Design a protein with these regions (language model features):
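Interaction/scaffold regions that mediate signaling and macromolecular assembly across diverse proteins
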Residues: 1-223
Length: 223
């Protein structure tokens, strides 16, 4: 049986992508009971599914309604279980297990609310960073995340993103990757782990290559 809350998250993302009215669905989110949400999202796969879909839906909704740039990530406009969250709360508090936005992922923020701590994942999955930026991919292969196949979806979106956003300079032996991999380096396991990830995806030996980071901006790419 499908999980009610992940199904609701799938629906609101689908409607937001079509730029249709999401207010009835947002009302349902607001009146969810925290105890039921916590009990229902009892695995990391369910948590990742629900919160990635909610994040991407409200990214689109907030961008459309406010017409703002980078400020949208701090705006408290996401009303769930009578709590009000920002995109940053979901990304860094829930999906990154209450980390500071800065600090490369090495510093935990003890000041997040009990609401966020109750709903946070038990283990950080570096692939969520690609899932939260998947709306900006030129070629989109995933309509929404589904808890029954989320492992495969996260692997797919990671592979797609890296193939599209990574540049090789064979002459200088350098690889340019999006700078959010540096910003959240600990989530990826460090610089060596980033290189191993690239080696797996491109199926080649990159030990003689240097990694360089290029600016990546979600808002500018969507506007």
């Amino acid at each position: 049986m499908k999980n009610y809350y992940t199904t609701l998250s799938e629906e609101i993302l689908s409607v937001a992508k079509l730029e249709k009215d999401t207010i009835p669905l947002r009302r349902q989110l607001f009146y969810i009971r925290l105890s039921k949400l916590e009990k229902s999202l009892d695995t990391d796969d369910l948590k990742k599914t629900f919160w990635i879909n909610i994040y991407n839906a409200f990214y689109l909704i907030t961008l459309k309604e406010t017409k703002q740039g980078k400020e949208i990530f701090n705006l408290k406009r996401i009303k769930i279980a009578r709590a009000i969250l920002s995109l940053n709360d979901i990304e860094h508090g829930i999906l990154r297990k209450y980390k500071f936005r800065i600090g490369y992922g090495y510093i935990t923020n003890p000041f997040y609310s009990d609401f966020i701590k109750k709903l946070a994942v038990s283990k950080v999955d570096y692939r969520i960073h690609f899932a939260l930026r998947s709306l900006n991919l030129a070629q989109k292969t995933i309509d929404y995340f589904d808890s029954e196949v989320i492992e495969e979806q996260l692997t797919t979106v990671t592979t797609d993103f890296i193939h599209l956003e990574t540049e090789f300079d064979e002459e200088s032996k350098t690889i340019q990757v999006s700078d959010f991999l540096l910003s959240y380096l600990k989530d990826f396991g460090g610089k060596n782990s980033v290189k191993k990830l690239l080696e797996r995806i491109f199926e080649r030996d990159l030990k003689n290559y240097k990694i360089r980071f290029k600016t990546y901006n979600r808002v500018e790419k969507l506007l």
